[in-house]
C-alpha cells in the first residue's frame, strides 16, 4: 500500500508526524509522503520515524494556489525556499492578527491551520465569510506558475491535487484546466483520491494518459475522525480501494527530474 497525500499536526492534521508514520506502518503501507499545507516543518520528524519503522518516506508539501487549487510537491530535496515562504506567510498573519487585537498566545496555535483559522475568525465575528478572512488576514494564494516553479526549484514533482475539489473545475473543463497548468510545467495529477466515484477515477486516469502526466494517488488523510479519508485508500466511503501500487514505478523513475 502507498499514500502520497497526507497531513500531520504541522498543518491541519490531528496526528504528529511520527504518529502518522506509525499508523501507516500498522496499516501496512510501504511508501508514504507527508504533504502538509504550505510548510515542511514535519518532514524531519516523519523521515526519522519512517527510518525506525522501515517504511519508505517521501518529502512533500501541499501548496495553496489561486482558485482554491492545491498543488502537491513530491520528492522534495531542498527546503529553504518553502521555509522562507512559510516564514513570510506566518509573519503576515501575525501582523494582521495583531492589528485585530490578538496576542501571540492566541494566534500561535492557529498559524498553519488555515481552514480552522478561517472558521474561528468567522465564528468570532472578525470576518463575514471565507473570502473576507482570506483578503484581510491571509496572504493571497500562490499563482500556479509560482507554486510549480517553487516545487521544481526544491527538487520536487508538481502534482495537481484532488481536481474534483477545485473551485469552478468539473468534468467539462478539467481538460482545459490541465492544458493551462501544463503551460506552467505541471508534472502529474492525483488520479486516485478520496471521495470520488470509479467513473471519475477512470475519467481522470484517461486525462492523465492523454496529457502525458504522471498519475499519483493520496487519501488526503487528516484525522482518525474523518472516516471518509483512510490512509492508503481512495474512492467513495462505501467503495474504498487501496491506492494502486502500479503508479509507484513511474513516480520513482521521475523523482530526480529536477535535481
Model-derived regions: residue spans:
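An N-terminally biased module of ancient metal coordination in phosphate/nucleic-acid-related enzymes
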Residues: 1-67, 137, 142-226
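Extended substrate/RNA-proximal surfaces in nucleic-acid metabolism proteins
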Residues: 48-182, 239-258
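Conserved, well-ordered active-site substructure
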Residues: 229-242
Amino acid at each position: 500500500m502507498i499514500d502520497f497525500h497526507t497531513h500531520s499536526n504541522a498543518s491541519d492534521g490531528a496526528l504528529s508526524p511520527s504518529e502518522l508514520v506509525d499508523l501507516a506502518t500498522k496499516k501496512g503501507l510501504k511508501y508514504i509522503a507527508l504533504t502538509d499545507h504550505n510548510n515542511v516543518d514535519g518532514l524531519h520528524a516523519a523521515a526519522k520515524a519512517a527510518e525506525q519503522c522501515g517504511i519508505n518516506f517521501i518529502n512533500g508539501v501541499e501548496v495553496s494556489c489561486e482558485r482554491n487549487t492545491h498543488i502537491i510537491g513530491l520528492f522534495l530535496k531542498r527546503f529553504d525556499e518553502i521555509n522562507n515562504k512559510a516564514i513570510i506567510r506566518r509573519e503576515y498573519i501575525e501582523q494582521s492578527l495583531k492589528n485585530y487585537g490578538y496576542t501571540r498566545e492566541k494566534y500561535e496555535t492557529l498559524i498553519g491551520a488555515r481552514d480552522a483559522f478561517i472558521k474561528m475568525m468567522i465564528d468570532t465575528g472578525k470576518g463575514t465569510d471565507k473570502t473576507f478572512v482570506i483578503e484581510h488576514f491571509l496572504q493571497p494564494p500562490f499563482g500556479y506558475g509560482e507554486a510549480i516553479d517553487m516545487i521544481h526549484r526544491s527538487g520536487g514533482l508538481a502534482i495537481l491535487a484532488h481536481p474534483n475539489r477545485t473551485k469552478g473545475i468539473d468534468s467539462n473543463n478539467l481538460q482545459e484546466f490541465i492544458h493551462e497548468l501544463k503551460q506552467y510545467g505541471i508534472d502529474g495529477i492525483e488520479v486516485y483520491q478520496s471521495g470520488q466515484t470509479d467513473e471519475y477515477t477512470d475519467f481522470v486516469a484517461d486525462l492523465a494518459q492523454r496529457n502525458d502526466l504522471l498519475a499519483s494517488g493520496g487519501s488526503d488523510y487528516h484525522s482518525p475522525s474523518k472516516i471518509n479519508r483512510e490512509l492508503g485508500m481512495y474512492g467513495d466511503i462505501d467503495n474504498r480501494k487501496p491506492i494502486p501500487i502500479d503508479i509507484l514505478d513511474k513516480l520513482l523513475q521521475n523523482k530526480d527530474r529536477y535535481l
